[in-house]
Amino acid sequence: MAYSIANNPLLRKNFAKIKKIIDIPNLIDIQKNSYKRFLQLDVPAEARKYSGLEAVFKSVFPIKDFSETASLEYVSYSLGIPKYDVEECHQRGMTFAAPMKVKVRLVVWDVNKEPSTRSIRDIKEQEVYFGEIPLMTENGTFIINGTERVIVSQLHRSPGVFYDHDKGKTHSSGKVLYSARVIPYRGSWLDFEFDHKDILYVRIDRRRKMPATVLLKALGYSTDELLNFFYKSEEINFAGEKLTKVADPELLTNQKAAIDIVDSATGEVLVKANRKFTKAAIRKMAEHGIKFIPITIEELVGKISSHDIVDPSTGEIVAECNEELTQAKLEEIKSKGINTFKVLFIDNLHVTSSFRDTIIIDKIGSTDDALIEIYRRLRPGDPPTLKSALSLFENLFFNPERYDLSAVGRLKLNYKLGLQVPLDCMTLTREDVLEVVRYLIDLKNGRGNIDDIDHLGNRRVRAVGELLENQYRIGLVRMERAIKERMSLQEVENLMPHDLINSKPVSAVVKEFFGSSQLSQFMDQTNPLSEVTHKRRLSALGPGGLTRERAGFEVRDVHPTHYGRVCPIETPEGPNIGLIASLSTYARINEHGFVETPYRLVQEGKVTNEVRFFSALEEEGHAIAQANAEVDKDGRFVADYISARKSGEFVLVGRDELELMDVAPMQLVSVAASLIPFLENDDANRALMGSNMQRQAVPLLRADSPLVGTGMERVVARDSGVSVVARHNGVVESVDASRIVVKIDEDEYDETGTGVDIYNLIKFARSNQNTCINQRPVVKIGDHVKRGDVIADGPSTDMGELALGQNVLVAFMPWGGYNFEDSILISERLVKDDRYTSIHIEEFECVARDTKLGKEEITADIPNLGEETLKDLDESGIIRIGAEVRPGDILIGKITPKGETQLSPEEKLLRAIFGEKAGDVRDTSLRVPPGVEGTVIGAKIFSRKGADKDARTELIEQAEEKKLRKDEQDEIRIIRESAVSKLKKLLVGKTAAVKVEGKDGKILIVKGKAISEEALSSIPIDRWDEISVADDESTDDKVAQILSTLNQQIDIIKYVFDDKVQKLKRGDDLPPGVIKMVKVYIAIKRKLQVGDKMAGRHGNKGVVSRILPEEDMPYLEDGRPVEIVLNPLGVPSRMNVGQILETHLGWAAKGIGWQIEEMLEKNSEKTKIKTYLKEVYGNKEMNKFLDTLDDEELSNVAKRLKRGVPMASPVFEGSSEEGIREMLGKAGFAHTAQVTLYDGKSGDAFKHKVTVGVMYVLKLHHLVDDKIHARSIGPYSLVTQQPLGGKAQFGGQRLGEMEVWAMEAYGAAYALQEFLTVKSDDVAGRTRMYEAIVKGKHTLEPGLPESFNVLIKELQSLGLDVELLENEED
């Protein structure tokens, strides 16, 4: 069967009603794009943007010495080729990294005699090795010391300005106190806050507070500048005895008129006394031409002057700026003949006097005093000078080296405060500070909004690239100090750049980050889904983030802006709930680190197919329709009013007001949650468990894709990177279990390409979680594959679809109490058919070291062991592949020299006579630990460079080399064949210009005759250059070109493979003191057994309680026994009804499969099968596909479908109940999906009908074999002498206080005494007991438990004199 037919995505019947607008973005692009932006490898050095690694270098360099006579400048960086490839790094325990070289320039200056001029004396440019930088693999992971790790993206508070209030909790009066905080990317924090007296204070770096005006004065502003910036002024006029003020419409709103406002021309009263100036009244006044409003002198008393009021005749200041005007002062102003002056507009309703009050309590006058005051607060104890104060203040907020808002911070500041500062200005400006304070004062006065710190516009994502950029910056700053010191200590003119640069501090920081940072995690490799989810995880924890203990409820909660960006379902249970989240399906991260989600644009009530990505801030204020809002075929909304989201609320809006629409219903949830069919029918808590448990599903021996899926299975399998995907279009040349060779189509590759793809498959490799990674080909020889097709399945994938569990026939009914409380009753059939058998691979390592007493040796010659024990070891002391081992068996034989003991003269004599005996070595072989039983599937040996190789190493090397040579020969063969076919096309039928003879003198090509295909086939290809065509130079040129390209390609292939073989034979880099290292891999087959944990996809989990013989299971009318019996009581209270709908739809899918099987068995006509399939699918595209199939292809499709027709019920747009009923009808089942079951033991029918169907059930990684544990004797704790605890320590079972009570209640005194003494920490007693058992006696002589001695010592250490008095018996 043509591969493309078997693998056609159309075979999964899809219930989706909404057309797909855009494809789901690659699921691991978040990792790959971030690292790509960080390295900018595909950009030439001179064209690189100021971001990532380039930005770090440019921000730290140039480095100048203290006297500024030399500077070290950065030019560019480049990366070399990694020493080992990914596979080798895995095997050798190395880091997959590339060497980095940085080109730097050392410029030395001559300082001239003229002040502040200098000339260049010398410039030296050099490329300096700068350590290694880890590279990301194709799948978005890093390989550090041989293990795959993932850098989790961090969700942290975005830099910018944030306004908040204390909710009235700070002061006892319950007054709401507002505050503002400016958070930079790096640098000092700036806080402004009001106290309960409405005075505005500022804190720098959370130090002691001071009046905010101190900071503003330090910025160079005077008191009157500040007052006039924060307050508006009113102009007051004396007109004889009358007092008037200028009618400013902006200030008049909501003020009251002191006296009637009358139009002097008509005498009409426009505003009555004590009435407010409304907008209508102000407009009326303007129409009547009233420019001045009469006021009373009482209104003016208590107002504040906004400028100095000066006597025009003498120049004397009558009232200073910020002075309160009293009755007397006003009289004085009037008497001096000052007719106009200005006062601050403060009405204590909409404008309060808080800022003016702050100026009053601030006793500092000048900018210099303000600078010194700030210096005193930040550096208490240091004597302040104006110069040091100024330099400290400049460095705080205005020096790009010390303070960085980042582009994001600047963007947020501009957005919040309405500024137009360019984005490349990344320090604070004076205007920024003023505007921050202005907004805070407005906020207090009731204008503006406080910020919600959980809004995704105020939180951003730091992905791998940015996290690593910060580490590099830390490392470079450390290196900068060292370089400056070196420049000052040595003569710079004699130095080269490499003498100054030591990259060790940088490498150390990066190494530490990858090795031990909280965000660098051991990849969860249980199955493909867990890998993908791990790479898409967002964590609020980690350096610079939150801590579990301090995180409150708000941070963890779901926020309206999470919609389409962060999954509201998938998060861990336990202390990290809500702090670790997962990116939604369609979400992506923009250049500023904000999470964006796609929307379709709506224009005039019509939805378009144009898609744009919006961040949470950009989305604010838009009306967004749901993806399932009803539209007609032209894209117009059907309803007049549509439910939409706007600014975090659900509202009904008219269709013309809609601006955006969701692209898909599943855009809300993450990848794991989108794999749960009928998610919309599950309770959210159970859905959370379901999405978490899918990540723990163990890859099974036989992958089986779900009958009821969601359509996401193919996407996850494709993007996870576990399956092998075709790189080019081509035809499969050869296939075996471990490699696939594809000959590329001619139009696919250029002249330089080899024209052949060889895919070496991964066979039985060990994952991080000890599960088995194995790839199996799904193509056959002759299949034509297209670029992007899956050609080999990986773990947990089936025909390119994710397959985490098995489709099993389940019945919901109680059965003999074996499914009480979530227990699961399973049929022995599942065990017999290996449906839930999984392979786990354990790695054991043995190291031979060079010790002080001599070298350890790996050998089969071990003293005091019988032949039976050593039967499976080869002569090198390593176990053979295929050996079945049990706990205690030797895997690698190793002997270690013993310390020399003093020998007696007699022993020395005997030793001199009989030679050295084997007494000076001890057996330190690697043995199989308890609980491990399996088959040896591999061994790897690493020897020091230059050391002699043992037989086993040579054997392994030969096998590897043979594999490489086979690849080499296949590549050469295929490109030769393609060259030959091209040449034949050119030459056959053309007239030969020269004759060509064979080695025996026989003429193969006759001059002047047409060249035949047989003649060409008889000539070896290396002699084809002798062939020439008459009167056709262009053909000759083409032939020569093809032959020369062929030879070049063959040379390249040989060179590449020779290099690989060389690498293979080279010794290994081992840690100091290690002579040889051997790793042995054991495959353990785990069948399903009682105690294993299983789960569905809806959070329905349970433990296998009994495995029942097939014949005892309840069976259907046709005699088929069910495979699993679940408890119906597990559904109602948990509210995960999705599992029942899945069971019904699975039952229909299975039933349709049985119908097809019946048709095939009866050899029904193909048209009948085709009609039935068309009926089932009811899909135009599928009908078209079925019509293109011939009988054989149709029968192959039918065979594939007889196990059940796979269905996709996508999240939030899945099959309706009617849809399920329709499918049940087509399968020939009752609409209730309930059947009569019969008891397997008695054969009687059960009283009630039972819900039966097919459910997808997973086996989780919590296997009973890993948990069961027993101990007789083992290690003891040093202090208490009690057995250690836990399986890993081979510990004992704790017998605590409550258990002692139980024993006491039963009066089991002797048993209890035994428990508390010889079985625990009575050292002497347990030794006596051991000896007694060896001698065959069974006496119990308990002594004093060691814990009693510990207690006495503790009391003595507290200074209490406790003595133990022994009763001497007479």
Curated annotation (Swiss-Prot):
Gene3D superfamilies: 2.40.50.100, 2.40.50.150, 3.90.1100.10, DNA-directed RNA polymerase, beta subunit, external 1 domain, DNA-directed RNA polymerase, subunit 2, domain 6, RNA polymerase alpha subunit dimerisation domain, RNA polymerase Rpb2, domain 2. One of its GO terms (cellular component) is DNA-directed RNA polymerase complex. It is an enzyme of class 2 (transferase). Keywords: DNA-directed RNA polymerase, Nucleotidyltransferase, Transcription, Transferase. GO terms for molecular function: DNA binding; DNA-directed RNA polymerase activity; ribonucleoside binding. Its EC number is 2.7.7.6. Pfam families: RNA_pol_Rpb2_1, RNA_pol_Rpb2_2, RNA_pol_Rpb2_3, RNA_pol_Rpb2_45, RNA_pol_Rpb2_6, RNA_pol_Rpb2_7. It comes from the Bacteria. It catalyses: RNA(n) + a ribonucleoside 5'-triphosphate = RNA(n+1) + diphosphate. GO terms for biological process: DNA-templated transcription. Coiled coil: none annotated. Belongs to the RNA polymerase beta chain family. The RNAP catalytic core consists of 2 alpha, 1 beta, 1 beta' and 1 omega subunit. When a sigma factor is associated with the core the holoenzyme is formed, which can initiate transcription. DNA-dependent RNA polymerase catalyzes the transcription of DNA into RNA using the four ribonucleoside triphosphates as substrates. This is DNA-directed RNA polymerase subunit beta.
